[in-house]
C-alpha cells in the first residue's frame, strides 16, 4: 500500500473557517438598507427564466450541533400552524410578482421539513400550487434527517 503524502502548504491554505452559504443571497444581504423596492426590482429581473422556490421549515425536535440553520427547537406542534399562516400571507403577497414565471424546482429546507405532519405538508404544497405556476414535472425535493 502506498504511503499518503500530505501537502502541508495546501492544508495550511484551507485550514481556516470560511463563510457558510446556506442561502442566496446570503443572510447578510438582507438588512435595513434592502428595501421593498429593491426586492420588487430584483423580482422583475429575468422574467423569462423559470423559477425555483425554497421554503424554509425552521422546526426541529432536537438540536443537531453541526447545524448552522435558523431553527426553532420545540415539541409544541401548534407552532407549525402559526408559521404556515404567516407563510401563506407572505406567499400571497409575493407570488403576484412572479405570476408569469414557471416554477420548475421546489425545495423544502431545514430545520427539519419532516417535522410537518401529512396535513401540514399538503397545506404547504397546496399554497405553492395555488399561488405559483408549478410545472407538472417540477423537481421537488425535501431535506430530511432520519
Swiss-Prot record:
Keywords: 4Fe-4S, Cytoplasm, Iron, Iron-sulfur, Metal-binding, Oxidoreductase, Porphyrin biosynthesis, S-adenosyl-L-methionine. It catalyses: coproporphyrinogen III + 2 S-adenosyl-L-methionine = protoporphyrinogen IX + 2 5'-deoxyadenosine + 2 L-methionine + 2 CO2. Binds 1 [4Fe-4S] cluster. The cluster is coordinated with 3 cysteines and an exchangeable S-adenosyl-L-methionine. S-adenosyl-L-methionine 2 binds at residues 66, 111-112. It comes from the Bacteria. Its cofactor is [4Fe-4S] cluster. S-adenosyl-L-methionine 1 binds at residues 54, 143. GO terms for biological process: porphyrin-containing compound biosynthetic process; protoporphyrinogen IX biosynthetic process. One of its GO terms (cellular component) is cytoplasm. Its EC number is 1.3.98.3. It is found in: Cytoplasm. [4Fe-4S] cluster binds at residues 60, 64, 67. GO terms for molecular function: 4 iron, 4 sulfur cluster binding; coproporphyrinogen dehydrogenase activity; metal ion binding. Pathway: Porphyrin-containing compound metabolism; protoporphyrin-IX biosynthesis; protoporphyrinogen-IX from coproporphyrinogen-III (AdoMet route): step 1/1. Involved in the heme biosynthesis. Catalyzes the anaerobic oxidative decarboxylation of propionate groups of rings A and B of coproporphyrinogen III to yield the vinyl groups in protoporphyrinogen IX. Belongs to the anaerobic coproporphyrinogen-III oxidase family. Monomer. PANTHER family: COPROPORPHYRINIGEN III OXIDASE, OXYGEN-INDEPENDENT COPROPORPHYRINOGEN III OXIDASE. This is Oxygen-independent coproporphyrinogen III oxidase. It comes from Mannheimia haemolytica (Pasteurella haemolytica). The gene is hemN.
Amino acid at each position: 500500500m502506498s504511503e499518503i503524502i500530505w501537502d502541508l502548504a495546501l492544508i495550511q491554505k484551507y485550514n481556516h473557517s470560511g463563510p457558510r452559504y446556506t442561502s442566496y443571497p446570503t443572510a447578510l444581504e438582507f438588512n435595513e438598507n434592502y428595501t421593498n423596492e429593491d426586492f420588487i426590482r430584483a423580482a422583475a429581473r429575468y422574467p423569462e427564466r423559470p423559477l425555483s422556490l425554497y421554503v424554509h421549515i425552521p422546526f426541529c425536535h432536537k438540536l443537531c450541533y453541526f447545524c448552522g440553520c435558523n431553527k426553532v427547537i420545540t415539541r409544541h406542534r401548534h407552532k407549525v400552524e402559526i408559521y404556515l399562516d404567516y407563510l401563506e400571507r407572505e406567499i400571497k403577497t409575493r407570488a403576484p410578482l412572479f405570476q408569469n414565471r414557471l416554477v420548475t424546482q421546489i425545495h423544502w429546507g431545514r430545520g427539519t421539513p419532516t417535522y410537518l405532519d401529512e396535513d401540514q405538508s399538503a397545506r404547504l404544497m397546496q399554497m405553492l400550487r395555488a399561488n405559483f405556476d408549478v410545472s407538472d414535472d417540477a423537481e421537488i425535493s425535501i431535506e430530511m434527517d432520519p
